[in-house]
Amino acid sequence: MTHVRDMDEADIEAVSRIRVRGWQAAYAGLVPGTHLDAMTVEDDAARRRQWFSRPGRTSRDLVAVADGRGPVGWLCYGPPPAGAPDPAGSGEVYALYVAPDLIGTGVGRRLLEEAHHRMRAEGFTASALWVLAGNERALRFYERSGYEADGRTQDDVYDEVTLTELRYRRPL
């Protein structure tokens, strides 16, 4: 059985492991291997500890916890970044990662449904997120969850390779 709860500081190592392994699994063939190979759980955990303890943080972190296994998924959401041209009332899912061996088992869906529930309770009326172009599994997942591409794109550079992200939105 898997349940969703707020992330706490004791979850940082597990969340970093999920995030790093999630990146390495989801983005193989999309993001340069040199970038993926350089990612470490230790470095990610150090950044996450610093970020998690930041005063005034407006983002929310959720973990999916499997009985007998601990955290197996992580989602972070909140208001759009400062200066983002989003309509009033929009929230953003910043990240969603599931342990690679549990992709397709409903863990991601549980996290996303809980995030949508909480976003509505916090007054958001829509949710946006960014998906790496070519990440077909993620695109299908979000489309099945009611998200649609809204035409906005942004570029990110990984080891001198420019990759495009697509923005997806849905009403809450």
Residue ranges and their predicted role:
Residues 90-91, 125-140, 144-172:
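C-terminal "cap" of GNAT-fold acetyltransferases
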